[in-house]
């Protein structure tokens, strides 16, 4: 059996640009991509915390240290500057591999400052 698992997650990054006329993609500060193990041109899913929109695109490297999160092309209609996003990448692996897999999760402050990194998401309490 093959399972699709969370590979990397950027939690609550803020959109710094939205460029409708760029050819598509989401530009992400290279430091952020490294923190979550996201590669350039990798497929990503984006969840907009502010408006509930969910969409897929691909990552492109933004300038390292710039804190850029630029939603480009048609997806720019789904996110505005200042919106909070969760950006995820996924990986497929065997059931056996999945049972010991840990994602790379990066948590951010309101100004796109990396606050902490983790290899698990805390258990949600009732």
UniProtKB/Swiss-Prot annotation:
Reaction catalysis annotation: L-aspartate + H(+) = beta-alanine + CO2
Modification after translation (UniProt): Is synthesized initially as an inactive proenzyme, which is activated by self-cleavage at a specific serine bond to produce a beta-subunit with a hydroxyl group at its C-terminus and an alpha-subunit with a pyruvoyl group at its N-terminus.
Pfam families: Asp_decarbox
Role noted for this protein: Catalyzes the pyruvoyl-dependent decarboxylation of aspartate to produce beta-alanine.
Gene3D superfamilies documented for this protein: 2.40.40.20
Cofactor annotation remark: Binds 1 pyruvoyl group covalently per subunit.
Name of the protein: Aspartate 1-decarboxylase
Catalytic residue positions: 25 (schiff-base intermediate with substrate), 58 (proton donor)
Assigned keywords, A-Z: Autocatalytic cleavage, Cytoplasm, Decarboxylase, Lyase, Pantothenate biosynthesis, Pyruvate, Schiff base, Zymogen
């Amino acid at each position: 059996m093959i399972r699709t698992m969370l590979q990397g997650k950027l939690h609550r990054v803020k959109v710094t640009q939205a460029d409708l006329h760029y050819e598509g993609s989401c530009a992400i500060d290279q430091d952020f991509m490294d923190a979550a193990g996201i590669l350039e041109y990798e497929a990503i899913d984006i969840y907009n915390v502010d408006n509930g929109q969910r969409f897929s695109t691909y990552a492109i490297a933004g300038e390292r240290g710039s804190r850029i999160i630029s939603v480009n092309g048609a997806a720019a209609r789904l996110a505005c500057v200042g919106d909070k996003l969760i950006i995820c990448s996924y990986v497929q692996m065997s059931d056996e591999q999945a049972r010991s897999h840990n994602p790379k999760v990066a948590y951010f402050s309101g100004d796109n400052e990396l606050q902490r990194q983790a290899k698990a998401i805390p258990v949600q309490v009732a």
